[in-house]
């Protein structure tokens, strides 16, 4: 007699270092699903955990970038990072994944994002930094739930932010795989 097994999706929190990523996240009256989570290491040092929350699961960068609705990249710091290093890492990820023309077209938005990042200052172990994209086509950055600076308009900016972790030259290829694991 044949047995029929049902495959039930596993929706469970993931813990990376001391940071727990719940299977769902509520943002602006929308429930986002954890697509994947992983670890960012630099020279064998755990720097942060990252989780990608989306309206629905996605397996490729293209799916994530083209998806409508709210999105969040959540970083959970596993060590203290000074402001300059945090901003430099953001800049590096953007430079590696955009052309000069793309950066020129987004120069005002990128300057606004860098200004927001500079307002954050040093981040401490245990801090949660969210890069949010809203249905109103705005990018915002929060630290421990507190909005830093102003929201920045434009869908193209958030696509650029996503490419830091999901682009062709993502800041960490293993982390990219983990975020797209779903």
Model segments located where?
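Short strand-turn-strand beta-turns centered on an Asx-Gly dipeptide
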Residues: 143-146
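Short, solvent-exposed mixed-charge patches
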Residues: 181-182
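Flexible glycine-rich active-site/ligand-binding loops centered on an Asp-His dyad
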Residues: 150-175
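N-terminal structural module
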Residues: 13-65
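Bacterial N-terminal signal peptides
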Residues: 1-7
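Mid-length scaffold segments of soluble, non-membrane domains
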Residues: 58, 62-136
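Sec/Tat signal peptide C-region and signal peptidase I cleavage site
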Residues: 8-12
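Short polybasic amphipathic segments
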Residues: 23-25, 138-141
């Amino acid at each position: 007699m044949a047995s029929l097994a049902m495959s039930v999706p596993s929706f469970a929190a993931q813990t990376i270092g001391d940071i727990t990523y719940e299977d769902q996240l509520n943002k602006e009256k929308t429930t986002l699903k954890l697509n994947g989570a992983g670890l960012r290491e630099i020279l064998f040092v755990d720097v942060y955990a990252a989780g990608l929350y989306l309206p629905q699961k996605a397996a490729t960068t293209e799916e994530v970038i083209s998806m409508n609705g709210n999105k969040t990249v959540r970083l959970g710091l596993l060590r203290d990072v000074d402001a300059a290093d945090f901003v430099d890492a953001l800049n590096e990820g953007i430079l590696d994944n955009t052309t000069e023309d793309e950066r020129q077209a987004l120069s005002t938005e990128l300057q606004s994002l860098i200004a927001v990042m500079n307002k954050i200052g040093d981040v401490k172990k245990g801090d949660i930094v969210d890069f949010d994209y809203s249905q109103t086509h705005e990018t915002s950055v929060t630290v421990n739930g507190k909005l830093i600076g102003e929201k920045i308009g434009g869908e193209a900016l958030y696509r650029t932010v996503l490419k830091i972790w999901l682009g062709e030259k993502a800041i960490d290829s293993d982390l990219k795989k983990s975020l797209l694991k779903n």
